[in-house]
Amino acid sequence: MAAGNTYSEEVLKATNWLQDNAQKEAFSYVFKTQKVNLNGKEIAWNNYNKDTTDAEMINLQRGAETSWDQATDMEWESEIDSLTKGQVLIFDSLVKKCLFEGILQKNLSPSDCYWFIQHEHGQDTGYHCHVLLGGKGLQQAMGKWFRKQLNNLWSRWLIMQCKVPLTPVERIKLRELAEDGEWVSLLTYTHKQTKKQYTKMTHFGNMIAYYFLNKKRKTTEREHGYYLSSDSGFMTNFLKEGERHLVSHLFTEANKPETVETTVTTAQEAKRGKIQTKKEVSIKCTIRDLVNKRCTSIEDWMMTDPDSYIEMMAQTGGENLIKNTLEITTLTLARTKTAYDLILEKAKPSMLPTFNISNTRTCKIFSMHNWNYIKCCHAITCVLNRQGGKRNTILFHGPASTGKSIIAQHIANLVGNVGCYNAANVNFPFNDCTNKNLIWIEEAGNFSNQVNQFKAICSGQTIRIDQKGKGSKQIEPTPVIMTTNEDITKVRIGCEERPEHTQPIRDRMLNINLTRKLPGDFGLLEETEWPLICAWLVKKGYQATMASYMHHWGNVPDWSEKWEEPKMQTPINTPTDSQISTSVKTSPADNNYAATPIQEDLDLALALEPWSEPTTPTFTTALTQHARFSNTDTSPTWSEIETDIRACFGENCAPTTNLE
């Protein structure tokens, strides 16, 4: 450098080291803690300061303390208390311990790796530690593996350093919270097509110079900034705050690209050639706010942002302006988000560590049928994420009061941007289904002449439909959710039944046949239920893609899918988890109706039409049957009922009549 004589040797060495490592790729991890309450015991970030006798840990803490003292600017008196300083030194030793153990587990040499560590305290995040890790043999595909190993090591060392007295069960629970809550996170990005999370590699030197070295040092309890930093080359360990900023400035100047003043005018800009009016700016801001707030109807707009609604209503042609604004909003949501995305974004991360999927009402409904409720929920999320292929419709069918509508209504309310099929409008039944994230068909019946249009929409095809008083409009692939008490696979046009439509309709349906009647006090689904179910599935590796579904369950679901296979596995050695109930038994006396054969005893025709009633007469009351079967766990079969009926008309039980 030309001006090298004006800078210290440490500054020049650090700058040259960053230049040499500017384009090297590295993983970006964040180590953190969360405030936990276990049986009334508060555990905060500064409670992991238990004294240690480990010689290696003590040496690491001494080295960190030396770096802290050397990097302190003596012109400014630090107000950081000794307890906070000691806690940061302990965390520094723990992070390095985790880092080196993770490297050795991969059979890598620490000398072949380069790393950078910086401890910080943020306004919203509190204490956290940034770690950049790269080296020979470290590839992008290994990022998630390292995150999992570092997370396990971090939780183990935190338990050992926790000064709050905990019972063995509480220690296990704290470690579960640390591992399930991902107290070590990895920088990732979402692929536009697959919607999967992939590891995001960073440029090692650029990241340090442009981001970490520009931060202010935390010197008071009220300020936010960095505490301490270190690296594999010992180049930034002892730099004071001013020297760090100088290194960042020199690095930026050395890598500044040559600028050439250019002016490019596009055809649209030349044609417009004017400044946007205040009205245009206001409309654009309103559309952006409506999209961010997920407002898709006039009522939602009135409730969430009444000021902008009144402002548009007061303008000339206000009704048309409001209508067009909402149309742009719904179009934006329909093209940029899926129904699954709109549900998942409502999940609260703070509730996920304590969430138990088996306690949700949806899974209880599936458990009544002895189904694998994880498999059912996974299949539903795939369809909502437009990953079901031709099977683009979720069909809840069965008798009344079995939970069909409460699940469908809950999902539709969470999505918000929903179109409804109107069977009463014979000519334009799908008039309300354009620019939507989900189509809801409640109590579907015979589709008659609309069956071909219905099949096209249910298979996720892009078709054009006619609208009343308008021209035709295109419907993009949109998932459909449907509830019915009838057999929609039987299509009747006039008085003629058309069996050729039965199999094509089945090929388009995710068949969920609910047959168990719910008790009267079952209640509705909680608002947070399905968002947490989706988040739980993602955390456990059940991505909302058909590739993930086939990986876990073997094949794509079809009309005769056996939801009870594979059977649910009860977790063991988990003292904090509640037992998962996979079945709900009810007796005829509980619901006050005459006992009828259970679904498993019906023949194939009744199995396909579970809402049809058997024609066999019933000769005993509910209370009598309940008393008879109180000592058994299974319901009577057809053969048992037939035996009872014959016994009632036998010689011993024949009724006597008086002819007089």
From Swiss-Prot:
Locus of motif RCR-3: 211-215
Gene: NS1
Provenance organism: Porcine parvovirus (strain NADL-2)
Known catalytic reactions: ATP + H2O = ADP + phosphate + H(+)
Principal location class: host cell
Official protein name in the record: Initiator protein NS1
Record domain SF3 helicase: where: 365-527
PTM summary: Phosphorylated.
Short sequence motif RCR-2: positions: 128-130
SUPFAM superfamilies xrefs: Origin of replication-binding domain, RBD-like, P-loop containing nucleoside triphosphate hydrolases
Residues noted as binding ATP in the record, renumbered to the chain: G398, P399, A400, S401, T402, G403, K404, S405
Entry-linked Pfam families: NS1_C (PF12117), Parvo_NS1 (PF01057), PV_NSP1 (PF12433)
Location of region: DNA-binding: 2-275
Keyword list, A-Z: ATP-binding, Covalent protein-DNA linkage, DNA replication, DNA-binding, Endonuclease, G1/S host cell cycle checkpoint dysregulation by virus, Helicase, Host G2/M cell cycle arrest by virus, Host nucleus, Host-virus interaction, Hydrolase, Magnesium, Metal-binding, Modulation of host cell apoptosis by virus, Modulation of host cell cycle by virus, Nuclease, Nucleotide-binding, Transcription, Transcription regulation, Viral DNA replication, Viral genome packaging, Viral release from host cell
Region called Ori-binding, residue ranges: 192-196
Cofactor remark: The endonuclease active site can probably bind other divalent cations.
Domain free text: In the N-terminus, the endonuclease region is involved in binding to the origin of replication. In the middle, there are the ATPase and helicase activities. The C-terminus probably contains a transactivation domain.
Lineage, opening ranks: Viruses, Monodnaviria, Shotokuvirae, Cossaviricota, Quintoviricetes
GO BP: DNA replication; symbiont-mediated arrest of host cell cycle during G2/M transition; symbiont-mediated perturbation of host apoptosis; symbiont-mediated perturbation of host cell cycle G1/S transition checkpoint; viral DNA genome replication
Chain ranges of the PV NS1-Nuc domain: 22-262
Assembly: Homooligomer; when bound to DNA.
Family to which this protein belongs: Belongs to the parvoviruses initiator protein NS1 family.
